[in-house]
């Protein structure tokens, strides 16, 4: 298939630049992946769509304030976006500047918050393709503490506004736990603590995986045929406890419901690993990077239902949804969402989708 097959017209006013005040009050488009049937709901209705004994899989990654502003020793301004923390003092980052810093260049970070000539000193140690390896000069302060002091919440480029104090809470799931993401697993933003308590009281089971969402999630697909696209790598943790819960849920005839595409990619990576290594179990623990790319024709081994936001045209995420619900069903649902003026992207509305069982084997 061609990347252009996943394009659609989206009026700018449908891009949500601020979240709803009440997390569960957003709209929910329910899509039956088997027949394409559509229902218009409110997100709080998921309480009626999820049954006792079903298993919800959440991504518990915590978004770090990964964007920093500063300057090079030469005086040139820089914008630094942490992609991955390597240890307490080193990180990989995207750096925007008029001229890329060279190996050994000194950087001064956070002067927009700390004042001129008071920036935190760092050194560009090496370049790895499009990423820069940076090390803090002062080893007495950990990177996470530095980010809490001078970092900005890394809002996606399409939100097109500076981050605000409220984003520290709004652009974070209520169950986030493990620091490391530079983008939120946005489907989870719609759950508040009250809804989680109601689901638990109903007998719905919860498990948590970790996938640290990278800035690569916003990168455009630059090839013509989707099969030629190479996904960026992101770190994933799927524990034995999660695997046991998934296997037990399947044996009981209940559904595994992934909250967000990152949860899908996490557990499907673990299931694919089990198959490739000849593990007789459906899924096995997974603690590694994944670059799994799911597009129409790929097989889902575990996930039965998906809760997800509305994604960018021609993105790998709309391709994943198309693989799950069927291409025609997905594009038709997006057409309806635009007509009905749903809000799109990270701070927008959501979908609840059950899988289209008519999919080919993963090649």
UniProtKB/Swiss-Prot annotation:
Pfam families: Queuosine_synth (PF02547). One of its GO terms (cellular component) is cytoplasm. Pathway: tRNA modification; tRNA-queuosine biosynthesis. It catalyses: 7-aminomethyl-7-carbaguanosine(34) in tRNA + S-adenosyl-L-methionine = epoxyqueuosine(34) in tRNA + adenine + L-methionine + 2 H(+). It is found in: Cytoplasm. Its EC number is 2.4.99.17. InterPro entries: QueA (IPR003699), QueA_dom1 (IPR042118), QueA_dom2 (IPR042119), QueA_sf (IPR036100). It is an enzyme of class 2 (transferase). GO terms for biological process: queuosine biosynthetic process; tRNA wobble guanine modification. One of its GO terms (molecular function) is S-adenosylmethionine:tRNA ribosyltransferase-isomerase activity. Keywords: Cytoplasm, Queuosine biosynthesis, S-adenosyl-L-methionine, Transferase. Belongs to the QueA family. Transfers and isomerizes the ribose moiety from AdoMet to the 7-aminomethyl group of 7-deazaguanine (preQ1-tRNA) to give epoxyqueuosine (oQ-tRNA). Monomer. This is S-adenosylmethionine:tRNA ribosyltransferase-isomerase. The gene is queA.
């Amino acid at each position: 298939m061609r990347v252009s097959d996943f394009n659609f017209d989206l009026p700018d006013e449908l891009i949500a630049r601020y979240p709803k005040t009440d997390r569960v009050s957003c709209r929910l488009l329910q899509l039956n992946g088997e027949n394409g049937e559509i229902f218009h709901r409110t997100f709080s209705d998921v309480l009626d769509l999820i049954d006792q004994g079903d298993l919800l899989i959440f991504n518990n990654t915590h978004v770090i304030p990964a964007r920093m502003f500063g300057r090079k020793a030469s005086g040139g301004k820089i914008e630094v976006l942490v992609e991955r923390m390597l240890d307490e003092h080193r990180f990989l980052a995207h750096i925007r500047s008029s001229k890329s810093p060279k190996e050994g260049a000194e950087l001064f970070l956070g002067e927009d918050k700390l004042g001129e000539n008071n920036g935190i000193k760092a050194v560009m140690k090496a370049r790895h393709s499009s990423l820069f390896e940076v090390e803090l000069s002062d080893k007495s302060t950990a990177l996470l503490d530095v980010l809490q002091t001078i970092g900005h919440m890394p809002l996606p480029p399409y939100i097109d506004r500076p981050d605000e104090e409220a984003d520290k809470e709004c652009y974070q799931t209520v169950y986030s736990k493990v620091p490391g993401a530079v983008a939120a697993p946005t489907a989870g933003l719609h759950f508040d603590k009250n809804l989680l308590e109601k689901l638990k009281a109903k007998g719905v089971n919860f498990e948590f995986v970790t996938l640290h969402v990278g800035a690569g999630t916003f990168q455009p697909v630059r090839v013509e045929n989707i099969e030629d696209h190479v996904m960026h790598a992101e770190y994933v943790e799927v524990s034995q406890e999660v695997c046991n819960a998934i296997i037990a849920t399947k044996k009981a005839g209940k559904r595994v419901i992934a909250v967000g595409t990152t949860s899908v990619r996490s557990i499907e990576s673990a299931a694919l690993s089990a198959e490739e290594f000849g593990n007789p179990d459906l899924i096995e623990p997974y603690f590694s990077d994944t670059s799994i790319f799911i597009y129409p024709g790929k097989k889902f081994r575990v996930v039965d239902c998906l809760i997800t936001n509305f994604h960018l045209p021609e993105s790998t995420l709309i391709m994943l949804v198309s693989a799950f619900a069927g291409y025609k069903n997905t594009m038709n649902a997006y057409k309806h969402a635009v007509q009905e003026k749903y809000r799109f992207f990270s701070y927008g509305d959501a979908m609840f989708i059950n899988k289209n069982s008519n999919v080919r084997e993963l090649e």
